[in-house]
């Protein structure tokens, strides 16, 4: 199977030749590590701050890594005193919806309070540009589809509320301090680096495409489909998947807009086309040539039937396009990464500690 790669260019109104030193918070994680590669390709100087609670030091292949928490005010003071950052990209957060319901204080502390500490350091050192990783979970249950930026934000879990609260704080910081930000609301991030250097290594894994491919490779006994009675053509939930490299391109364009003096803004990021759980499984079987073991379970509370993005505003204002986000391409890149992980584990069975931060790799089921 031929895998698609793509070279991106910014629209004419956004300059790309501005030298920059970027602080990437959470750069050892899934999306953050892909962003480091994109920024390095653009010639940026890079510093990553990550506590490695969910990220991996070996994913920080570009720039320097400072191991520590974004909630550590003393550490931030040292960092901002030592470096003159042009902007900050903030990827660090806890992202599991279920865990946010059972441990809301942990999520508000990590996602909201730690971001306040970061903003205080930025304000103290006159760093006034931030690209923030937000989420479609700020919208809650969809009132219409596809969902644009005008859709009411009514988050239904602490994870979504923590991100929504940060968005409100950022709007206030712009008005009070001139600290400009771009909030990027992902729908379903998926895929892996087209060149095979990076990919998903969540532990535990919660993203559907990665889980399906683990079932295809044999690292997982099966994939569980939660609910077959939704009001969709095949009865399973529909989601909008956007390639991680496309997300990084949106971050790059947002950064360039801020560096060029552009205003604060929020954008929805998605492919604009949804795929059902059953379609994802079928696509995985086509790409891998393997049968995916499937089990069926009841609906999960709070799962909407359909979540699809209207990303026209990002196209109009940033010139962004989801160029790699067709399901076949996403699946192909993710499968390439899954195969590379399996090969490493076959060559060195004890490599799971290094690859996955010491968590058990062979856990079966969901």
Spans of features found by a protein language model:
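Residue-level signature of the cytosolic catalytic core of signaling kinases
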Residues: 68, 201-205, 273, 323
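Short, flexible, glycine-rich and Lys/Arg-enriched loop motifs at helix boundaries
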Residues: 57, 187-208, 218-239
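Short-chain dehydrogenase/reductase
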Residues: 108, 156-164, 198, 202-210, ...
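C-terminal substrate-binding subdomain of Rossmann-fold SDR/epimerase-dehydratase oxidoreductases
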Residues: 211-366
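Short, contiguous clusters of charged residues that form electrostatic/catalytic patches at enzyme active sites
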Residues: 74, 78, 113-117, 164, ...
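Glycosyltransferase donor-binding loop in the core domain
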Residues: 71, 92-95, 107, 204, ...
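N-terminal Rossmann-like NAD(P)+-binding domain of SDR-like oxidoreductases, especially those catalyzing
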Residues: 2-192, 366
């Amino acid at each position: 199977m031929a895998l698609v790669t793509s070279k991106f260019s910014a629209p004419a109104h956004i300059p790309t030749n501005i030298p920059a030193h970027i602080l990437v918070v959470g750069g050892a994680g899934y999306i953050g590590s892909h962003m480091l590669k994109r920024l390095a390709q653009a010639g940026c100087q890079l510093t990553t701050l990550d506590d490695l609670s969910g990220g991996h030091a070996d994913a920080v292949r570009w720039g320097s890594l400072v191991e520590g928490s974004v909630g550590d005010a003393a550490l931030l003071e040292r960092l901002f005193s030592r470096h003159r950052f042009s902007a900050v990209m903030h990827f660090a957060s806890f992202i599991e919806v279920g865990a946010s319901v059972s441990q809301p204080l942990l999520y508000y502390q990590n996602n909201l309070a730690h971001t306040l500490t970061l903003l205080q350091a930025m304000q103290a050192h006159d760093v006034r540009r931030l690209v923030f990783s937000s989420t479609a979970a700020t919208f809650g249950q969809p009132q219409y589809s596809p969902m644009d930026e005008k859709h009411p934000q009514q988050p239904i879990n602490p994870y979504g509320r923590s991100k929504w609260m940060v968005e409100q704080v950022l709007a206030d910081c712009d008005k009070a301090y001139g600290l400009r930000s771009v909030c990027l609301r992902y729908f379903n991030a998926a895929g892996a680096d087209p060149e095979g250097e990076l990919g998903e290594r969540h532990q535990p894994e919660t993203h559907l495409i990665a889980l399906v491919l683990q079932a295809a490779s044999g690292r997982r006994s099966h994939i569980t489909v939660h609910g077959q009675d939704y009001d969709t053509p095949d009865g399973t939930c529909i989601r909008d998947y956007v390639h991680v490299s496309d997300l990084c391109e949106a971050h790059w364009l947002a950064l360039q807009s801020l560096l060029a003096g552009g205003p604060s803004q929020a954008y929805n990021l998605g492919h604009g086309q949804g795929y059902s759980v059953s379609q994802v499984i079928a696509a995985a079987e086509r790409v891998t040539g393997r049968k995916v073991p499937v089990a069926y379970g009841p609906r999960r509370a709070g799962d909407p039937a359909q979540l699809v993005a209207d990303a026209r505003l990002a196209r109009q204002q940033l010139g962004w396009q989801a160029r790699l986000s067709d399901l076949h391409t996403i699946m192909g890149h993710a499968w390439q990464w899954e195969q590379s992980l399996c090969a490493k584990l076959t060559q060195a069975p004890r490599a799971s500690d290094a690859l996955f931060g010491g968590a058990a790799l062979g856990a079966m089921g969901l």
